[in-house]
A protein has these predicted regions:
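S-adenosylmethionine
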Residues: 1-213
Length: 213
């Protein structure tokens, strides 16, 4: 709103803690890892309203078809120039009511999470383990990269979250996903061997602080 903060007592860490609403231990960790300027940039960005990203279900249709469907319902869309299948939507509180969502043409997923799935590099026909899968978005995107060919074992330790993974896979029409109640920290030989393993245990961690303060 343009107002200036009142004087803040304490050193630089304390001032940044108040200015950016961020705990000192996070600020200190960022400084040690990335330096002062990158830390400031990160903290400034964390206060901005983050864009709403979605991943197009390329196993069901093209990016262009999904974008057209969204635009016909009055949603403004930007295709991400860097990440295939990634689109940014105008903020809306009724995503679930959109035809594109109900027909399984997309799922909501932050860009950082989509990058994790892209870095996995899963290929059609491979067997993939997603260790901490809920709510399933990275499994969904990996399945789409695979053309829904192969198998993805999506594990979590909570039955309710496994249910959500199954519901999401059904809506998207992804048949290669096997949601399983499983503790990834406990070795289970019955799982067999995998071509690739995805473990994003902190779900992109501090990088989503702007979305989940």
């Amino acid at each position: 709103d343009g107002k200036e903060l009142p004087p803040i007592k304490g050193g630089q860490l304390r001032q940044w803690e108040v200015r950016y609403s961020c705990p000192q231990w996070i600020i200190r960790s960022l400084q040690q890892s990335y330096g002062e300027q990158a830390t400031i940039d990160f903290l400034e960005y964390s206060l901005e309203r983050p864009p709403l990203y979605a991943r197009v279900n390329t196993a069901r249709g093209s990016v262009e078809a999904c974008v057209k469907c969204l635009q016909e319902e009055g949603v403004r869309v930007q295709i991400d120039p860097d990440l295939p299948g990634c689109i940014a939507l105008e903020q809306t509180a009724s995503i679930e009511r959109l035809s594109a969502f109900q027909e399984g043409l997309l799922h909501i997923q932050d860009k950082s999470s989509q990058l994790c799935a892209a870095a996995l590099g899963a290929k059609p026909g491979e067997r993939v383990l997603d260790c901490c899968a809920a709510p399933g978005s990275k499994s969904f995107t990996a399945a789409e990269w695979m053309g829904d060919e192969g198998e993805i074992v999506s594990c979590d330790i909570f039955a309710e979250k496994i249910k959500k993974i199954k519901q999401g896979a059904k809506r998207l029409g992804l048949s290669c996903i096997r949601a399983r109640l499983q503790d990834a920290t406990a070795f289970d030989p019955s799982l067999g061997q995998f071509d690739r393993v995805l473990c994003d245990a902190p779900c992109s961690g501090i990088g989503i602080i702007g979305r989940k303060p």
